[in-house]
Amino acid sequence: MKPSIILYKTLPDDLLHRLEAHFTVTQVPNLHPETVARHAQAFASAQGLLGTSETVNRALLEKMPALRAASTISVGYDNVEVDALTARKIVLMHTPTVLTETVADTVMALMLATARRVVDVAERVKAGEWTESIGPAWFGVDVHHKTLGIVGMGRIGMALAQRAHFGFTMPVLYHARRRHQEAEDRFNARYCDLDTLLQEADFVCVILPLTTETRHLFGTTQFARMKSSAIFINAGRGPVVDENALIAALQNGEIYAAGLDVFEHEPLSVDSPLLNMSNVVAVPHIGSATHETRYNMMACAVDNLIDALQGKIEKNCVNPQAAG
């Protein structure tokens, strides 16, 4: 008899068939309490859980006594109570490698769009404001040869540094928990403390996970340390930034512009002042959102769950100690 799993994400047919070859699959729209109650028997017997974005907490785990592995279609997992899973000896699998290049592309796009005011001037053209040869009111600023500061030199940070160093001849500064010798050797990146990075960088790009230490790492003090010409990019997690402090910094001219893929609360409220600022490019958490990469993430998550329920957790496991 095949193990049973709960699937709370719609998958392409080929990936669904791959799951069904190994498991009895119960598909549900979400992990809301009413959904769990409606499918109580399936949740109670499920050994695997696969999906994305929904909260996985102690209350859910109480309804899933047979659960052995959870697989998220994401690199981030701040919506999952990892400690609760580990205490139950449930492994958590994620997809950290397949989205690296795509997210780095998104960060680069935000840098270019904010610096060259692509969204702002495109909207002005659509509004019929381009009636004569443009002047300085339409100008942006250069990207090439400007100093890039990367906060969080992981896989995505490395991919961004590669693009900036080789493609745009940008000096690269970085701040991370530890020195990254490969970044220094390949891209001539310079490690520095956060204050120094903020003071020297023309672009401050944040690519950090959300942890107790990183929550609101960027606030009033940090924005005040940046150049008034600096462009701030966040493609990590929204709550790493105190959004009210960012709004104030933009309104007061403490920084030049911001390109944002993530926000403290998502979806972003239609009343957010960020949406009324011409120097803000706000996109709806599209970091990995290409057809190719999202498919690859789903395929990776499927393979991760198959492997985990066969006891293979050598790669992509968040909490390998749970298997001990």
Curated annotation (Swiss-Prot):
A Gene Ontology molecular function term of the record = hydroxypyruvate reductase (NADPH) activity
NADP keyword on record: yes
Where does it mainly reside?
cytoplasm
GO cellular component: a single term: cytosol
Q: What reaction does this catalyse?
A: glycolate + NADP(+) = glyoxylate + NADPH + H(+); (R)-glycerate + NAD(+) = 3-hydroxypyruvate + NADH + H(+); (R)-glycerate + NADP(+) = 3-hydroxypyruvate + NADPH + H(+)
- Provide the protein's localization: Cytoplasm
Q: Does the keyword NAD apply?
A: yes
Q: Which SUPFAM superfamilies match?
A: Formate/glycerate dehydrogenase catalytic domain-like, NAD(P)-binding Rossmann-fold domains
EC number(s) recorded for this UniProt protein: 1.1.1.79, 1.1.1.81
User: What does UniProt list as catalytic?
Assistant: 237, 266, 285 (proton donor)
- Which class of enzymes does this protein belong to? oxidoreductase
Recite the UniProt keywords alphabetically.
Answer: Cytoplasm, NAD, NADP, Oxidoreductase
PROSITE patterns annotated for this entry? D_2_HYDROXYACID_DH_2, D_2_HYDROXYACID_DH_3
Q: What does this protein do?
A: Catalyzes the NADPH-dependent reduction of glyoxylate and hydroxypyruvate into glycolate and glycerate, respectively.
Instruction: Give the family per the record.
Output: Belongs to the D-isomer specific 2-hydroxyacid dehydrogenase family. GhrB subfamily.
* The protein's assembly and partners: Homodimer.
Name of the protein described by the UniProt record: Glyoxylate/hydroxypyruvate reductase B
Species the sequence originates in: Salmonella paratyphi B (strain ATCC BAA-1250 / SPB7)
Q: Could you tell me the gene encoding this protein?
A: ghrB
